[in-house]
Amino acid sequence: PDVKSGSCLIAGFQPLTVVHPSYWNAYKTESGATFSIDMVRLKLSFINGKGEWLSTHAQTFDCDSMSAWTSKIRPGGWYELWSFDLGDSSVALGIGFMEPSCKVNMNRGFIEFNPNKVAGDKRFWRLLEKLAPCVSHARLKRFDLAYDLPTSRLDCRLSKDRRMYKSVISNGITEYLGVKNTPGYVKVYDKAAEMHLSGMLTR
């Protein structure tokens, strides 16, 4: 088998050799801060019959490994969920939206991915090339904006307002403002500690 060198865990220790997270099409300010898109979710409308085609051909997509789940009929859920592992991240694909009538609409779907982690992988673009002919319309449903500061987490604080606030002390201090999965939700945490970076970085 092919053996490739790279960052690895040995006896539970992570070497501090990474100096920054991966970015794709990021914007860097003069102060050294970095803006990037850390998650994208697209709502998909499939051409008639193409949802069924994807259901039977998704297993041919090139990736490290894949997982697939078929859900019970539950209004508002997804009939099929696919996960394609690409390196240290993955791409999620949903096929078949469950309507309030409990009918499965195979012409609806979604795709979710982190461009910072998968856009540098050629297999991701090949996956999109296979998906594109099946889609009649794609609409941006959600994106997460990452703002990275080359500063210690101890020097940063989240300004509270009337939204729900929570603070967690575990592997550094993590603060939350707002309701998860809703517009304006904010999370401030020690990115350096999370990724075992050699320098200081707060996201």
Each predicted region: which residue ranges?
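Structured, helix-rich domain cores that form ligand/interaction pockets
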Residues: 1-202
